[in-house]
Amino acid sequence: MAYPGKKSKSYETPRHPWQEARMAAEVQLVKAYGLRNKKEVWKAASMLRMYRSEARKLLAQVASGGQEGELEGHYATQSEEILSKLIRYGIIKADANVDDILSLKTENILERRLQTQVLRLGLARTVIQARQFITHGHIAINGRKATIPGMLVSKEDEMHIGYYGSSPLMSESHSERPVQVASFLADSATTLKAAAEAKQARERPPERGGGRKKRGGRR
């Protein structure tokens, strides 16, 4: 138990710190979503792990419930609360069920961060610039300044994200305001990770066949 007033760690570190595949995937997420470090990836992964753990417990209750396969009592209430929260934040669709929680990935959580939404709404040119605008107090939700890039944004609040009233960015002639939104940002079905992978594939130089032949032995 932590001391009163002392913040406890809100994430779990990887059990095996030197797994090459996991480390490469974390670096890819850090770059795609403009994260400060891997701790922000671990926070999202820990949140997802919590929801998936609750979903497994609920599905176990469904399996042990007999032929009806329906949750009753506080299990049904718990299921409704989890689903309604995930739907409210746009992490799952409105018609999703408990099974759909198990198919979620870390990027589904990262997509709902304020930093990601500022980029998708065309308020910043890059994901790094989106983070800068937020931390410098240029972004507001419902007119209130928001300075935490990692806060999760609900679907309702998403409609009210904009520049803060006294920010210089309120001027349409400001040089740092983006002119237009990229096409992949307007498509919410395409995650920033998928867009980054597609861009990397396009920029990768084609492999040349053959190569210079080695000369024969010494004369």
Curated annotation (Swiss-Prot):
Pfam families: S4 (PF01479). GO terms for molecular function: rRNA binding; structural constituent of ribosome. One of its GO terms (biological process) is translation. The keyword Metal-binding does not apply. Residues 193-219 are annotated as: Disordered. Residues 112-174 form the S4 RNA-binding domain. Keywords: Ribonucleoprotein, Ribosomal protein, RNA-binding, rRNA-binding. GO terms for cellular component: small ribosomal subunit. SUPFAM superfamilies: Alpha-L RNA-binding motif. The keyword rRNA-binding applies. Residues 199-210 have a biased composition (Basic and acidic residues). PANTHER family: 30S 40S RIBOSOMAL PROTEIN (PTHR11831), 40S RIBOSOMAL PROTEIN S9 (PTHR11831:SF5). One of the primary rRNA binding proteins, it binds directly to 16S rRNA where it nucleates assembly of the body of the 30S subunit. With S5 and S12 plays an important role in translational accuracy. Part of the 30S ribosomal subunit. Contacts protein S5. The interaction surface between S4 and S5 is involved in control of translational fidelity. Belongs to the universal ribosomal protein uS4 family. This is Small ribosomal subunit protein uS4. It comes from Methanosarcina mazei (strain ATCC BAA-159 / DSM 3647 / Goe1 / Go1 / JCM 11833 / OCM 88).
